[in-house]
């Protein structure tokens, strides 16, 4: 398969919602000695009318209820349940974790995975963090933004997980998939498979561990990739020179440049003048009338609410509601 191209943009968001709300991640400022901290909520399901591909995923064995089994070569991971019940498997031993258990740790090198426990009510919320190893590739916000972004897009829109792409992203976050339990030295085999296939071979084939569409601190992600001989060719540094919109606006000349005999083609030749309304964008945000959504369930806006905020009189609101119901 060809290297992956993201389907959605989530960079710059401190709260990211994946799989239609099945998974919500809130990035927080980490405490001293930890390289990341986030609060994460898993739901068992999404009720109501949802897109067919999402419903199919929820009803399948691939339903996102937690990450696959993995281990961290250099970092200890910490879990603190806020509500609900967390299930966690560590080196084959499954535990049931509740808020009363306080913070628990999974030491570096332990094969583990966690999930929303079947005994949990509708949702489960947990705080996750990890020790700071000081390595370029480690569990941090850059990794999680890209893993959750790819996981979402691959399962919903790209036909499933691409093995090389998966290994490339996992290697970028000190998260490695172990070999089957019957394989001798399963952790070493898993680690070097991720490095050789994900970083070395994948890098040469154009597979990136990080994508700008998902990554808030892109400069940091670029610095990470530049540290690898096999990935530095994937980095394009021109973005560092891109000026902000304010700086670009300052470059606009006071008058329109002239183009001699070619000037007429740079002007509006239509006999009917172009009539444009006020610009609906302000500081990059759209403030015009929002179109109605095909799915207004689960608390998601249909666009009607936005129109009600923009229109003043009851008569105008009545027209909007009537039109939305047609």
Swiss-Prot record:
It is an enzyme of class 1 (oxidoreductase). Residues 287-326 are annotated as: Disordered. Residues 292-304 have a biased composition (Polar residues). Keywords: Cytoplasmic vesicle, Oxidoreductase, Vacuole. GO terms for biological process: patulin biosynthetic process. The keyword Oxidoreductase applies. Transmembrane segments: none annotated. GO terms for molecular function: oxidoreductase activity; polyketide synthase activity. One of its GO terms (cellular component) is cytoplasmic vesicle lumen. Belongs to the oxidoreductase OpS7 family. This is Probable oxidoreductase patJ. It comes from Penicillium expansum (Blue mold rot fungus). The lineage of its organism: Eukaryota, Fungi, Dikarya, Ascomycota, Pezizomycotina.
């Amino acid at each position: 398969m060809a290297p992956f191209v993201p389907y959605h943009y989530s960079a710059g968001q401190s709260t990211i919602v994946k799989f239609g709300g099945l998974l919500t991640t809130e990035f927080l400022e980490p405490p001293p000695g930890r390289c990341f901290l986030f609060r994460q909520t898993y739901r068992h399901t999404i009720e109501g009318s949802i897109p067919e591909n999402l419903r199919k995923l929820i009803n399948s064995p691939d339903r996102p209820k937690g990450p696959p089994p993995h281990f961290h070569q250099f970092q200890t991971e910490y879990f603190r349940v806020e509500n609900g019940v967390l299930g966690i498997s560590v080196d084959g031993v499954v535990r049931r974790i509740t808020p009363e258990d306080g913070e628990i740790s999974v030491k570096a090198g332990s094969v583990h995975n966690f999930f929303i426990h079947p005994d949990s009510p509708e949702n489960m919320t947990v705080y996750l963090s990890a020790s700071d190893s000081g390595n370029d590739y480690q569990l941090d916000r850059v990794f999680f933004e890209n893993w959750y972004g790819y996981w979402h897009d691959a399962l919903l829109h790209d036909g499933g997980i691409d093995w090389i792409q998966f290994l490339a992203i996992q290697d970028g976050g000190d998260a490695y998939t172990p070999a089957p339990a019957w394989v001798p030295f399963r952790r070493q085999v898993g680690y070097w498979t991720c490095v050789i296939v994900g970083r070395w071979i994948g890098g040469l084939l154009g597979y990136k561990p990080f994508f700008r569409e998902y990554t808030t601190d892109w400069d940091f992600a670029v610095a990470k990739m530049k540290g690898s001989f096999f990935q530095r060719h994937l980095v394009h540094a021109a973005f560092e020179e891109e000026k902000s919109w304010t700086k670009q606006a300052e470059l606009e000349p006071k008058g329109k440049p002239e183009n001699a005999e070619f000037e007429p083609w740079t002007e509006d030749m239509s006999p009917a003048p172009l009539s444009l309304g006020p610009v609906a964008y302000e500081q990059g945000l759209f403030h015009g009338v929002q179109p109605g959504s095909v799915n207004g369930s689960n608390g998601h806006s249909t666009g009607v609410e936005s129109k009600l905020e923009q229109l003043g009189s009851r008569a105008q609101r009545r027209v909007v509601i009537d039109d939305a119901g047609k």
